[in-house]
Each structure stands twice: as C-alpha cells, then as structure tokens.
Amino acid sequence: MRIHYLLFAFLLVLLSPPAAFSKKINNPVSCLRKGGRCWNRCIGNTRQIGSCGVPFLKCCKRK
C-alpha cells in the first residue's frame, strides 16, 4: 500500500507545471485572483487570459 503514496507523489510532481518558467495564469487560484473563472471554453463577451492547470479548462474574463 505504501507504493500508492509514492506513485501519487511522483505523478503530482511530474504533472505539475514548473512555476519558475511561466508567468501565465495556470491554476484556479490565480485565475480567481485576476478576476476570471475556469470554464471549458470562453463564450459570449469573455476572453481567455490563461488556463486553469489542465488542458481543457480555460481562465476566462469579461472583456
């Protein structure tokens, strides 16, 4: 059972984006701080200002 914890920690580190190399919004907390929301796609009068950490979620803000 201990191997599950190690595997989870390894995947967490492997899949986390390196924060030092990117100044873009790339997590939900940063998105909310910038006044945006995480959506599948930006619709209507919103524009994409970043991503929310996963490829299919975008950080959208009103124009």
From Swiss-Prot:
Induction line: By bacterial infection.
Disulfide bond sites: 31-59, 38-52, 42-60
Tissue expression summary: Highest expression in salivary glands, epididymis, ovary and pancreas and to a lesser extent in lung, liver and brain. Low or no expression in skeletal muscle and tongue.
Signal peptide: 1-20
One Pfam family, short name: Defensin_beta
GO BP annotations listed: defense response to bacterium
Subcellular location field: Secreted
InterPro entries, sorted: Defensin_beta-like
GO terms for cellular component: extracellular region
Residues that make up the propeptide removed upon maturation: 21-22
UniProt keyword terms in alphabetical order: Antibiotic, Antimicrobial, Cleavage on pair of basic residues, Defensin, Disulfide bond, Secreted, Signal
Function according to Swiss-Prot or TrEMBL: Antimicrobial activity against Gram-negative bacteria E.coli and P.aeruginosa.
Assigned protein family: Belongs to the beta-defensin family. LAP/TAP subfamily.
Protein name listed in UniProt: Beta-defensin 3
Taxonomic source organism: Mus musculus
Gene: Defb3
